[in-house]
């Protein structure tokens, strides 16, 4: 069993504030852009299935992010973990049986 990150509501609020500041140009960085691009990619993929889930390959997520470091397959799942911790997606299962669901609209 993989242990998932657990944040307090205050930590989630702080992280979302940081992401919104990146969106608004108050903080320089690509982290918010990567999370946003991945969310939009997952939302599109999930909308194509009957049960509203998707299970993209790691390299597909990196291509969607515009990253050329395809050997770093863990990067996409790291961002998925962050999106799940913040409450935007839900992941179930593992490996080929993993399912990703969109749980709420992105607001950062």
Q: Where would I find each of the regions flagged by the language model?
A:
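Residue-level marker of intrinsically disordered, low-complexity segments enriched
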Residues: 4-5, 10, 25-26, 87-89, ...
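Winged helix-turn-helix DNA-binding recognition segment
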Residues: 46-103
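Short, amphipathic alpha-helical interaction segments positioned at domain boundaries
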Residues: 106-108
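Short recognition helix of helix-turn-helix/winged-helix DNA-binding domains
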Residues: 1-60
């Amino acid at each position: 069993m993989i242990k998932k990150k657990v944040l307090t509501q205050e930590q989630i609020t702080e992280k979302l504030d940081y992401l919104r500041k990146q969106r608004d140009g108050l903080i320089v960085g690509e982290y918010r852009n990567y999370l946003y691009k991945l969310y939009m990619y997952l939302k599109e993929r999930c909308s194509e299935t009957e049960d509203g889930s998707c299970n993209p390959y790691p390299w597909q997520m990196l291509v969607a992010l515009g990253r050329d470091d395809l050997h770093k397959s863990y990067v996409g799942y790291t961002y998925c973990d962050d999106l799940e911790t913040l409450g935007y997606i839900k992941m179930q299962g593992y490996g080929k049986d993993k399912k990703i669901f969109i749980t709420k609209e992105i607001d950062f």
